[in-house]
Design a protein with these regions (language model features):
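Phosphate- and divalent-cation-binding pockets in alpha/beta enzyme and binding domains
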Residues: 28-30, 103-107, 154
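Conserved RecA-like P-loop NTPase helicase motor core
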Residues: 62-73, 123-216
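A contiguous, basic/glycine-rich beta-loop/short-helix subdomain that forms a polymer-engagement track
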Residues: 1-65, 125-128, 132-134, 142-147
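Conserved helicase motor "Helicase C" RecA-like lobe of SF1/SF2 P-loop NTPases
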Residues: 94-124
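Conserved RecA-like ASCE P-loop NTPase motor core of nucleic-acid helicases/translocases
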Residues: 18-23, 92-103, 215-216
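Conserved interdomain hinge at the start of the Helicase C-terminal
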Residues: 9-13, 60-99
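A short beta-strand-to-loop transition that corresponds to the Sensor-1 phosphate-sensing loop
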Residues: 21-25, 99-101, 146-149, 166-168
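Short glycine-/polar-rich loops that comprise or flank the Walker A/P-loop
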Residues: 14-16, 39-42, 54-57, 92, ...
Length: 216
């Protein structure tokens, strides 16, 4: 649903001043356009993060081309990189944002027997909550392998000390709504992609005294 047509009648009409707060606005012009707001009627106030950068480092590790034409050939490279990260963090819980069930399955089958017991994963949406609960309830260094938990979950402190974002999460252009919104506003497509990355990044560091490393 495009919220722009509903923002004023359903939200803004309840007050003379409205405060919208978010850690993931990212690009104010695109955000305002998505809500149908006139930039001349909005004041944008930026506040610095209270989370120290040294406690939430990002490591860039390009290892595979996961576009449609290269996915099949390069999936083993990605899986090998995830296995290496599991070995690098033998005593720490982590989360692997796989982007799709196909990628998640390829990683799952590539994990060697000595590490497979650490994996907590699901093969469709119905298993999502059970996989998350299995990860959180296990005191051991489990690794949550999922394509669908970039937002809405809290992996604070020891629930995740490292995470991997396996692929740039471009929205699926086969979705008619996505295709129509990109055609109308190309900036929205890039903004939505960056938003998903930032949301995934935020799953593991939940407070100023938390810490986790993110691999891209």
């Amino acid at each position: 649903v495009d919220a722009a047509a509903f923002t004023k009648p359903l939200l803004l009409r309840f007050g003379d001043r409205v405060l919208l707060m978010s850690a993931t606005i990212l690009d104010p012009p695109t955000y305002l356009a998505s809500l149908g707001l006139d930039p001349d009627e909005v004041a944008v106030v930026r506040a610095p993060s209270t989370f120290p950068p040294e406690r939430r480092p990002v490591r860039l590790r390009p290892v595979a081309r996961l576009t449609r034409h290269h996915l099949e050939a390069d999936l083993p490279k990605l899986a090998a990189a995830v296995v290496e990260l599991m070995r690098r963090h033998p005593q720490e819980k982590g989360v692997v944002h796989a982007h799709s069930y196909r990628i998640a399955r390829a990683i799952e089958v590539a994990v060697p027997a000595d590490l497979r017991g650490r994996l907590r994963t699901h093969h469709d949406a119905s298993g999502r909550d059970a996989a998350l609960a299995a990860h959180l309830d296990d005191p051991g260094p489990t690794v949550l392998l999922t394509p669908s938990m970039t937002e809405g979950i809290d992996l604070a402190m020891d629930a995740s000390r490292w995470q991997a974002i396996c692929k740039v999460p471009w929205p699926f252009l086969g979705d008619p709504q996505v295709a129509a919104r990109r055609a109308r506003d190309p900036d929205w497509y890039a903004w939505r992609t960056c938003l998903t990355v930032v949301q995934a990044y935020g799953r593991s560091v939940r407070s100023a005294d938390d810490a986790a490393v993110t691999y891209l």
